[in-house]
From Swiss-Prot:
Protein name as annotated: tRNA-specific 2-thiouridylase MnmA
CDD domains: MnmA_TRMU-like
Key words, A-Z: ATP-binding, Cytoplasm, Disulfide bond, Nucleotide-binding, RNA-binding, Transferase, tRNA processing, tRNA-binding
Disulfide bond entries: 108-204
Chain segments annotated as coiled-coil in the UniProt record: none
Pfam families reported for this sequence: tRNA_Me_trans (PF03054), tRNA_Me_trans_C (PF20258), tRNA_Me_trans_M (PF20259)
Entry EC number(s): 2.8.1.13
Catalytic center residues: 108 (nucleophile), 204 (cysteine persulfide intermediate)
Function: Catalyzes the 2-thiolation of uridine at the wobble position (U34) of tRNA, leading to the formation of s(2)U34.
Protein family: Belongs to the MnmA/TRMU family.
Signal peptide range in chain numbering: none
Gene: mnmA
GO cellular component, one term: cytoplasm
Domain of life: Bacteria
Length: 374
């Protein structure tokens, strides 16, 4: 079953967010097949730097245009770089400056794709927008629910949890009912230019650059000490912002006497002392948390939290659903997990589910230590 198409689809004008990737390309094609009046829109959300780094935006625009030409639809372009800088990138920098690890894709969806793009599309006369996200929607009892995508390997509801039901109600997700290989097969069948194009990975405005090189353009590095849980200094870091909880690579620790062969992991970031706390072993007790505190909660639809709720949650993308109890506190929300969770990271998002329904989520403020810690 695909996104329900109303009987008068020919009267419905849909503008598809065309990224230059295969998912949005096939989304536009499927909507044409369903009888909608379809147009595309390519968003430029970042002004590339003046320098040697090459931004892929021009390639993506060319691919989007090639697909639109092939399937016979108009392609609009819009520049949301100012909105992106103000509403996404400045927050991204502020979070890293505060020693946290943000997820700009979630803010981008809320502020750009389902706000700036949605408003722009409506200004162009659209009835609906569409994107190539692997999620589904369901209209029930006067509200619109956000559901997980049918392909568990590609489900993107984690990234859309902060988008409200009113925005979801104005959006179609044509590939949400499909698995990725099916989408590729459709693109190849119709000989779309994006059929074999690799999926984009990483943060859009960084591209192929090293993350540390990009970040130091905007934030001054503050080197400090690397310490063990016992307080022994075993190295120096270039800045807490370059490290995240659970990180193994790039610590520059090695050859320590009596340290053994187990790899080192980031366990804590002490902002007061600018120290990076590390320990050995993939299952070091300090890596685990029994609960978390969250703020900046966004619900797709209002929910009743007058009593604690039994739900499932994800503390990172593609994590399997984790059983928890969610309750409202005086300062935010607290989720207590049935099983200890590894590498719960402040600044990242926790997203709550009721079965296949994505309820919403928020920003992790505090990871409460597991009682198994020494």
């Amino acid at each position: 079953m695909r996104d329900p198409a109303p009987s008068d689809t020919s009267k419905k004008r849909v503008i598809v967010g065309m990224s230059g990737g295969v998912d949005s390309s096939v989304s536009a094609l499927l909507l044409i097949e369903q009888g909608y009046e379809v147009e595309g829109l390519f968003m430029k959300n970042w002004e590339e730097d003046d320098g040697t780094e090459y931004c892929t935006a021009m390639d993506d625009l060319a691919d989007a245009q090639a697909v639109c030409d092939k399937i016979g639809i108009k392609l609009h372009t819009a520049n949301f770089a100012a909105e992106y800088w103000d509403n996404v990138f400045e927050h991204f920098l502020a979070e890293y400056k505060a020693g946290r690890t943000p997820n700009p894709d979630i803010l981008c969806n809320r502020e750009i794709k389902f706000k700036a793009f949605l408003d722009y599309a409506m200004m162009l006369g659209a009835d609906l927008i569409a994107t190539g996200h692997y999620v589904r929607r369901r209209d029930i009892d006067g509200r619109t629910e956000l559901l997980k995508g049918l392909d568990p390997n590609k489900d993107q509801s984690y990234f859309l949890h902060a988008v409200g039901g009113e925005q979801i109600a104005k959006t179609l997700f044509p590939v949400g009912e499909l698995e990725k290989p099916e989408v590729r097969a459709i693109a190849e069948k119709y000989e779309l230019a994006t059929a074999k194009k690799k999926d984009s990975t990483g943060i859009c405005f960084i591209g192929e650059r090293r993350f540390s090189d990009f970040l130091k353009q905007y934030l001054p590095a503050q080197p400090g000490e690397i310490k063990t849980t016992e307080g022994e200094v075993i190295g120096r870091h270039h800045g807490l912002m370059y490290h995240t909880i659970g990180q193994r690579q790039g610590l520059g620790i090695g050859g320590l006497k009596d340290a053994g062969d187990e790899p080192w992991y980031v366990l804590r970031k002490d902002l007061d002392t600018n120290e990076l706390i590390v320990g050995q072993g993939n299952n070091h007790p300090w890596l685990f948390s029994s609960a978390l505190l969250a703020s900046e909660i966004y619900w797709v639809n209002p929910i009743d939290l007058s009593q604690p709720l039994r739900l499932t949650a994800k503390v990172r993308y593609r994590q399997s659903d984790q059983a928890c109890t969610l309750e409202k506190t005086d300062t935010g929300y607290r989720a207590v997990f049935d099983e200890p969770q590894r590498a719960v990271t402040p600044g990242q998002s926790v997203v709550f589910y009721d079965g296949e329904i994505c309820l919403g989520g928020g920003v992790i403020e505090v990871a409460e230590p597991w009682s198994g810690q020494a």
